[in-house]
Regions:
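Extracytosolic ligand-binding ectodomains
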Residues: 2-459
Length: 459
């Protein structure tokens, strides 16, 4: 039997704390230099980051992604590499920003790099991200990590581009990627690719989606269509709901399930059988007792990219319109990675993508031991990208090449970190090697292991 997600998290102990130093550290894969670590005393706190002004915008960007244009080479430097961290270190998101900074500091400590210096800058405030980028670049930053929010990325990007310095943002909004900007967050596209590919490998043919009527929902539908075009099958149904609909989705799910047409077809079948007097027809009519509809919905896999209370409000309503989740496979997103998902019977047997839970658990243990707190979900992005920077300082670039050139950042073998393997693609999006989890009551388990290299097939 495959181990459950919860058992992975419980297995981290004193022994794995030591293993963390070798396993969770990011290393360039397949032929590039690995990083070997030993446990050391936790470093002294670093000086407080320089602040800019208060109030970072958080609304997502809406512009289409631009193709990544290689920078002319970036700054050529010797000695210690300076890497900026653009984070909201004051204001409403200060706790998140501090957690991201903690994760980056932890990565620097574990890497034992003496060739890397972090330059934290506060993005809070009107124009804060642009001011933070300018401040860091004036201090000699050769690479920018962050910001978190898409609008802040848009503000910082032109400043960095003018200096030929690449940006690896912590956003998951692919619309800000391109022209020297990378998106290292967990994009819906990457998540949907993984779960659709897995569903296809298990026989799913016809896909449907039940999504919020929002830009996120639109992006999810586009990602589903693209994934199905890549891996095969067809998208047969799409239904949208507003954010206030989740407690009663009756009209939306009724239409999604073709419930009225299937009820009408059942009625016709019953009437036809009732008009006959032979024993076979009588037996067939009796078998229809308790049946609500004729046939199945026009899909065998249903994507529901929600989580938390919304997911738990939506799922029980499926059976009201005869969507039998024993015959229709439910598919989810990272938002399903919640212990309460396991308590909803309608989601039993559903699949969702996730980073490898064992390496994630090791990162969380390391963070907890160091900072006496649990890291937020996206803190591992700051951890992994800081380790990426540390790894690239371990080897010298080619003559005339920047340490953080586009070519070095986008090496096809990729990197491995707390969230498994990832690589920065030429379109500015991070591709990730994800696992697939199957939901079961108090015992969800991995059914599709995460790949360990990018030439390894997944199923």
């Amino acid at each position: 039997m495959m181990p459950s997600i919860s058992s992975f998290l419980r297995r981290v102990d004193a022994v794995s704390w030591r293993l963390l130093l070798a396993v969770s550290v990011l290393a360039v894969l397949a032929g590039c230099q690995n990083v070997n670590l030993v446990q050391r005393k936790v470093p002294e706190p670093r000086p407080a980051p320089q602040a800019t002004a208060p109030g970072e915008p958080q609304t997502p960007a809406t512009e289409a992604p631009a193709p990544l244009t290689p920078l002319p080479g970036g700054p050529i430097s010797t000695g210690k590499a300076r890497v900026a961290l653009l984070l909201p270190l004051s204001g409403a998101n200060a706790a998140l920003g501090q957690s991201m900074l903690n994760a980056a500091e932890l990565a620097l400590f574990l890497s034992e790099s003496d060739k890397l210096e972090l330059l934290p800058r506060d993005t809070e405030g009107p124009g804060g991200a642009a001011a933070a980028a300018s401040s860091a670049l004036d201090a000699g930053a050769e690479l920018i990590l962050g910001p978190i929010f898409a609008n802040a990325v848009q503000d910082a990007a032109p400043i960095a581009r003018a200096r030929n310095v690449p940006v690896i943002s912590f956003s998951n909004d692919g619309t800000v990627a391109g022209n020297g900007v990378f998106v290292a967050g967990f994009t819906p596209e990457n998540q949907i690719d993984r779960v659709v590919a897995f569903a296809r490998s298990r026989g799913a043919q016809k896909f449907a989606a039940l999504v919020p009527d929002s830009p996120y929902g639109t992006r999810t539908i586009e990602a589903l269509r693209q994934s199905v075009a890549t891996f095969g099958g067809s998208v047969t149904r799409v239904a949208r709901y507003t954010s206030t609909d989740t407690q009663d989705l009756s009209p939306v799910i009724r239409q999604l399930a073709d419930y009225d047409a299937r009820r009408a077809a059942l009625r016709v079948n019953r009437e036809a059988l009732a008009a006959k007097n032979d024993e076979a027809s009588k037996a067939a009519l009796k078998r229809l007792d308790g049946v609500e509809t004729a046939g199945d919905p026009q899909f065998d896999a249903l994507l529901i990219p929600e989580g938390g209370s919304r997911l738990r409000a939506i799922a029980p309503q499926l059976s009201l319109f005869d969507i039998d989740t024993r015959r229709v496979r439910t598919l989810g997103s990272f938002d399903w990675n919640d212990p309460l998902t396991e308590t909803e019977p309608a989601l039993n047997g559903g699949w969702y993508p996730t980073p490898p839970p064992d390496s994630r658990a090791q990162f969380e243990t390391s963070y907890q031991k160091t900072f006496n707190a649990s890291p937020p979900r996206i803190a591992s992005i700051a951890f992994d990208t800081t380790l990426l920077a540390a790894v690239l300082t371990r080897t010298d670039p080619d003559p005339g090449q920047a340490r953080f050139s586009i070519e070095r950042l986008t090496q096809p073998n990729g990197f491995a970190g707390a969230d498994g393997i990832f690589r920065l693609k030429s379109n500015g999006i991070a591709e990730r090697g994800l696992a697939v989890v199957e939901v079961h009551l108090r015992a969800s388990r991995i059914v599709g292991p995460a790949p360990t290299t990018f030439d390894q097939p997944t199923n």
